[in-house]
From Swiss-Prot:
Belongs to the DNA polymerase HolA subunit family. It comes from the Bacteria. Its EC number is 2.7.7.7. GO terms for cellular component: DNA polymerase III complex. This is DNA polymerase III subunit delta. It catalyses: DNA(n) + a 2'-deoxyribonucleoside 5'-triphosphate = DNA(n+1) + diphosphate. One of its GO terms (molecular function) is DNA binding. DNA polymerase III contains a core (composed of alpha, epsilon and theta chains) that associates with a tau subunit. This core dimerizes to form the POLIII' complex. PolIII' associates with the gamma complex (composed of gamma, delta, delta', psi and chi chains) and with the beta chain to form the complete DNA polymerase III complex. InterPro entries: DNA_pol3_clamp-load_cplx_C, DNA_pol3_delt_C, DNA_pol3_delta_N, DNA_polIII_delta, P-loop_NTPase. It comes from Buchnera aphidicola subsp. Schizaphis graminum (strain Sg). One of its GO terms (biological process) is DNA-templated DNA replication.
Amino acid sequence: MKIIYPEELKQKLIKKLNYFYILLGEDSILLSKAEQLIFYFAKDKKFIEKNTINIEKSTDWNKVINFHKSKNLFFKKTILIINFTIKKLNLSLVKNINKIPLFKNKDILTVIKLNALSSLIKKSTILKILILESEIIYCSTPYEWAFKKWLQYEIKTRNLKITQESFLLLHKYYEGNTLCLNQILDILSITWPNENIKIEKIKKIINQFSIFSPVNWINAIFNKNKKKAIYILDSFFKQKYNPLILIRTLQKDLLILLNMKREKKLNINFFLKKNNISLNRSKFFANALYYIDFNNFLKIIRILLQIEIKIKKEYNNSVWIQLKTLTLLLSSPMKYTP
């Protein structure tokens, strides 16, 4: 399976526009950017019309068949977007999907969004016929080297002049948060379009426009990145974010972590998939499983309960002090020895 990464897509489209594209992953920013690029180059080839078919159940595939049957003399060049919201594939649907290349037509450009099915496709050959005929674009949230390459590409695309120190700061605080970083880069390009952007300017923008999710906070904790975890928590405090959402999200992930610890033979990816956790987070759970002192779990659960009671009875800023204590406790590198 040959994968096209987001930073490679534009050059691929310049060379050749294919008739089949598979968008593999669930990152909303990467999906949106990939679609926009495909649409832009398709428009140049006179693909003006768009038709979206959502596959929510296996019988919805009939809509795809009917679309192809409806082609007539007055048919205009169309981009067909097949959007899978279904969570599982049955044999009948697999057979039908693999037949898509048989419908190959110079007037139809097909974009397949696999969404939640992406992890299944990466590890299986069930759609091998479709994969052989398609360009596969990787749209999962990038981390580490992949995030670095994507960030470099986005900076270059906007013609931003950013110092190495500034680049490293953006990478440090926004790794895995494409939504927030995309917005920050847009702000930088509007604010300082032709200037050399030094770290002081980056810090100023970061302090003014910080958009994080509870998952970003938990990932930083599980990755032993105390400084980043506290920074994200402070951002939530400034935004007057509902701390109960943070508590519930953390409780859920800690429970999953505890159940992972109890497994005698653990397949992390399978376990996370079963619990509806993105496989992109597997490294964070693996890290936490390795270093968190599970003897502290009772203490952690006790603090969580205290915070929840305080939120419901007499909410005040001391809740955030307790959340900070909890963050430091969880992100301390205490290797667990079984």
